[in-house]
């Protein structure tokens, strides 16, 4: 690594930054946006997808998932994640930030069987309070792996080192 020149362990990697989230609201169409983003990623030859998005509830009462749907085969976004994995794309998905909410469980597409669902832990290896957990509706353990997610050193938009969760 050369300071200011090269940082990381994959200096020859190339990246596609694809945004599918509409920050103004939460509607089921956002699953369609996510699926379109994954389809685009596949069309340009992406090998690895990381996604911090997860859904379980939307802004309309008639479009709320139930925990019985956490089977990897019900939610559109979960089916699309499995299809991407079947095509050879390694897909990492956040377990979700619902650990302290009444939902508490992983969010979709984290329930998909063929993807890697990532949870968060503290520096003393305890589950971060916000991190979602499994089981899935069909009794699979999720998340698949965990990583430091509380009090992480990060660089902010101004280039300063600060701490954040996620």
For every predicted segment, state its role.
Residues 16, 50, 90-92, 117, ...:
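Structural detector of well-ordered beta-strand residues that form the stable sheet scaffold
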Residues 3-4, 102-106, 129-132:
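Short beta-alpha junctions and helix-cap segments that line functional grooves
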Residues 110-166:
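Extracellular S/T/G-rich loop segment that most often corresponds to the catalytic His/Ser-adjacent loop
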Residues 39-71, 94:
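Short acidic, glycine-rich surface-loop motifs adjacent to enzyme active sites
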Residues 57-58, 97-103, 124:
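Active-site environment of divalent metal-dependent phosphoester hydrolases
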Residues 1-30, 44-47, 58-61, 86-88, ...:
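Subtilisin-like serine protease catalytic core
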Residues 42, 82-86, 146:
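Anion (oxyanion) recognition and catalysis
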């Amino acid at each position: 690594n050369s300071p200011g020149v090269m940082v990381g362990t994959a200096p020859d990697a190339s990246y596609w930054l694809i945004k599918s989230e509409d920050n103004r609201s939460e509607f089921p169409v956002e699953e369609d946006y996510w699926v379109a983003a994954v389809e685009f990623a596949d069309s340009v030859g992406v090998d690895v997808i990381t996604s911090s998005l997860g859904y379980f509830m939307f802004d309309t009462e008639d479009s709320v998932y139930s925990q019985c749907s956490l089977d990897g085969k019900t939610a559109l976004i979960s089916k699309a994640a499995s299809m991407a994995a079947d095509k050879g794309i390694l897909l990492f998905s956040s377990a979700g930030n619902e650990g302290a909410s009444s939902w508490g469980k992983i969010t979709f597409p984290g329930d998909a069987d063929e993807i890697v669902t990532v949870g968060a832990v503290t520096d003393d290896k305890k589950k971060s309070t916000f991190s979602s957990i499994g089981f899935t509706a069909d009794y699979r353990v999720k998340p698949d792996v965990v990583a430091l997610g509380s009090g992480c050193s990060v660089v902010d938009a101004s280039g300063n080192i600060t701490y954040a969760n996620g």
